[in-house]
Amino acid sequence: MSKQPLKYLLLWLLPLLLSANFVNWLGNYDVAHQKALKEHKLLLVLVVKKNNSLSSQIIKNSFMDQDYVDGINSKMVPVIVTYEGALSYPIEMYYTTIFPTLFFVDSSKETFLREPLYGERITKEEIQKLLQ
């Protein structure tokens, strides 16, 4: 079997992958909080539950290849935390029973800037409105 078709396929896919617009999620709350403080940015906290199809769907549909992704990356420090990893983030501050939940936080005061978005309310339209 020739490697030539695979080579051309990879060359064709590379620009698509490089042009994909996605949120630069961090996976550690403490690191994200320190970065947000240092850069004077807001903290965007997405709490997900492992093996939750709605969480995966929302990440794919609302946080990939959207016009507002650059705005999120420039104005905020986004972090994903898992409910099951409760020791890795202040669960008492981000307590929720609905997954996923999206919190908008003033990093210096550790206060919520608005009501969180829960589950299916995390839509492209809602996120776009918040960034205007």
Whereabouts are the PLM-identified features?
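Short active-site neighborhood of thiol/selenol oxidoreductases, capturing the structured segment around
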Residues: H40-S53
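Thiol-based oxidoreductase modules, predominantly thioredoxin-like and allied folds used
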Residues: V23-G27, V48-K49, Y68-L87
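Solvent-exposed loop/turn segments at secondary-structure junctions
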Residues: K50-S53, S62, Y83-L87, T97-I98, ...
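N-terminal leader/targeting and pre-domain segments
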Residues: N21-E39, L131-Q132
